[in-house]
């Protein structure tokens, strides 16, 4: 969204140049929504079900606490509908519920660094989350695990590889009138 983008003026300029902008949001009056050609109204998070994966690698279960109204759609419903509208129906046959989608995701991770084949949908319901990798057959012994504690990295050499980018200059100068710079937490690579 524009409000939290690293440089929202650049975002606005880019949005104005787009041929077509789709925004999915629970509000229709956001600054970003004002630029869109198509607004997909979404149910708020209190009505959603599914599994979230954060940047700490933690899978958490999102349980709805409010009922959806008739014709109200969640993110999942919207993305599933778009997929079907694009002719992907056969590929999405197994995706009837968020649980089904999770099972499909889980199968895709087998043997990968992010393997979650040991995570079961029900184990996430009342937990504080499970960090990947968590392979089938592993036992969850602790609440938090650190990735690469064993010094084994997913690189050809097995060693850590650091990738960095040059720090961009601050787009605004501090002044007496505006002595503080605001950091949204977003960077050019991701958000942490």
List the predicted regions and their residue ranges.
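Non-catalytic, well-ordered alpha-helical segments in soluble enzyme domains
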Residues: 76-93
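Generic alpha-helical secondary structure signal
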Residues: 9, 13, 77, 96-99
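Short amphipathic alpha-helical surface patches that mediate protein-protein
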Residues: 87, 99-106
